[in-house]
Amino acid sequence: MDVQICRGVKVKKYRGIIPGDKEKNQMTSKHYKYFQPNDKDKKDDQSDCVIRALCKVMNKSWLEVFDELLPFARELQCMPNSKPCYETFLLNHGFVYQEISNKKGIKLPTVDSFTKDHKDGVYVLRLAHHIIASVDCYYYDTWDSGDCCVYGYWKK
């Protein structure tokens, strides 16, 4: 079990089946699909959400995306999974960013509701401390982040 920030609150992030909790085990969204392109990360604990999301939207392997991020990271002198690096990468690959207003009184969409409303297309969703891919009515991650708020997205 890990802790994840969701809607500004720390929540417990369970991996796989929750022992003794049949209700939670059956609560996975129908729009969620498990996605782990990193063959070396058997426990889903590498904190490589940026690379995983880019693998899905670019239809490339984990190593291909990692290698393509390195020149941007070197140029910007930052880590490959840092915001300046992946933003530059996405812009260079034709993605356009759309901020979602989080003004007082405006409810942010959840990953699940965003995916339902954006049935067609390729998106990279920005959550609190997390990035995921949304492609043609499904969101892809190593855990079901459907209840987390979307703060912005890149669309191809």
Name each region found by the language model.
Residues 12-79, 84, 88, 92-93:
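Active-site nucleophile-adjacent alpha helix/oxyanion-hole segment immediately C-terminal to the catalytic cysteine
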Residues 141-156:
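Noncatalytic regulatory segments and standalone regulatory/sensor domains
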Residues 73-129, 135-144:
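Conserved active-site-adjacent core of cysteine acyl-enzyme catalytic domains
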